[in-house]
């Protein structure tokens, strides 16, 4: 606790964490909000899954590219442009009704994905410039816990609004977060103080670094599993009561507690696999016992591993690339997670249509098993950060010597 207390006393840390959290909050709401909105209109989880797939394609194309643009044109211009376009597309989805065809919803989802603001790569690049080397790993842990508010509490809010108001309400609230949170983050002084150097490497080269690729793949599988779990919980209880929101809130609490409790533990090469295994065990048990009480207990257990696993991913990437490549590297990792959020919901939707709600938990367990196995098989590509600085490697270049 004292570690996090001193960290939050560091100038600007609390403000930038909160601002980026609000700006990124739509990422946790929109997948499930789109799923419920399109499913209600067209009465098909499959149709909703197609819209989410289109959104994920847009995110896949744009994520690393817009992150790299920040090193060329600066963070603020890129964030302003993408936030504006994304907001327009998201509001258009919310205004869609029975006369709006699935292909039109898909086109709007694609545009929203293409314009997804690169807030995560921006803030991950700023962090090492705000704190000393000893504070960086706890900062990643604190940030990972905050991110779980996005991924887990976001769907709770989307579900509550869909039940109490209308499925479009969750989408419109997400648009409000896009505007308000985006403006707050963009106005942060740190965005003016930190300049991302232009990378000297070709686009995509950083993804070829084994630690970055490993973190991208495992992050994709982890968030896909979380989205499948969320869709499964909604399918179990439907839109007619508060139970789904309660279960997802318990899932969120588990993640927050896990992130804060385990965030100080040094990161070893096996840390990623171990933390993925915690989530796998909880999810597998939830797939067997789906009564309200047992589902809550087992998803709490699964949640305990989520934020710690994400903290490992962030630290592995930060310690494995040069500063000029950090934005693009985090762009790839963030894209993997966003695609996972969309495709996890989409896959779960198709399975729910075919086999019922339990199928979504089976899908999630399979994704987590794959993630844990990959993390274990390639643990040598996860650096040993016990007693080591988790900050990025400095950029170096030849220096002219006057003789």
Regions found by a protein language model. Name each.
Residues 21, 102-118, 220, 295-308:
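Hydrophobic core of transmembrane alpha-helices in multi-pass small-molecule transporters
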Residues 34, 117-131, 308-321:
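Intracellular juxtamembrane helix-capping segments at the cytosolic ends
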Residues 84-99, 279-291:
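C-terminal ends and interior cores of transmembrane alpha-helices
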């Amino acid at each position: 606790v004292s570690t996090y207390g001193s960290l939050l006393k560091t100038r600007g840390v609390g403000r930038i964490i909160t601002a980026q959290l609000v700006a990124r909050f739509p990422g946790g709401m929109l997948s499930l909000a789109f799923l419920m909105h399109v499913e209600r209109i067209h009465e098909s989880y499959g149709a909703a899954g197609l819209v989410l797939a289109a959104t994920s394609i847009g995110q896949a194309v744009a994520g690393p590219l817009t992150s790299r643009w920040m090193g060329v044109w600066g963070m603020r211009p890129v964030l302003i442009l993408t936030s504006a376009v994304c907001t327009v597309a998201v509001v258009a989805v919310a205004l869609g009704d029975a006369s709006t065809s699935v292909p039109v919803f898909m086109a709007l989802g694609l545009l929203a994905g293409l314009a997804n603001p690169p807030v995560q790569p921006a803030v991950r690049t700023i962090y090492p410039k705000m704190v000393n080397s000893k504070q960086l790993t706890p900062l990643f842990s604190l940030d990972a816990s905050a991110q779980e508010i996005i991924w887990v509490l976001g769907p709770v809010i989307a579900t509550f609004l869909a039940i109490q108001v209308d499925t479009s309400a969750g989408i419109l609230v997400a648009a409000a977060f896009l505007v308000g949170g985006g403006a707050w983050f963009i106005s942060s002084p740190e965005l003016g103080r930190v300049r991302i150097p232009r990378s000297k490497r070709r686009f995509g080269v950083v993804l070829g670094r084994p630690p970055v690729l490993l973190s991208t793949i495992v992050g994709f599988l982890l968030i896909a599993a979380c989205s499948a779990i969320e869709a499964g919980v909604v399918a179990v209880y439907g839109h007619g009561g508060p139970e789904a929101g309660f279960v997802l809130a318990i899932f969120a609490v588990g993640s927050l507690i896990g992130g804060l409790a385990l965030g100080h533990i040094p990161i070893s090469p096996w840390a990623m696999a171990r933390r993925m295994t915690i989530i796998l065990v909880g999810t597998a048990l939830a797939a067997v016992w789906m009564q309200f009480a047992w589902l809550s207990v087992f998803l709490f257990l699964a949640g305990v591993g989520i934020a710690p696993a994400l903290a490992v991913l962030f630290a592995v990437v930060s310690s494995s690339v040069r500063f000029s490549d950090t934005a693009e590297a985090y762009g790839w990792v963030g894209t993997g997670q966003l695609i996972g959020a969309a495709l996890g919901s989409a896959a779960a939707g198709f399975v729910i249509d075919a086999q019922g709600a339990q199928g979504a938990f089976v899908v999630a367990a399979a994704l987590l098993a794959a993630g844990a196995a990959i993390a274990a098989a390639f643990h040598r590509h996860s650096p040993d950060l016990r007693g080591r600085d988790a900050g990025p490697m400095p950029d170096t270049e030849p220096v002219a010597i006057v003789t």
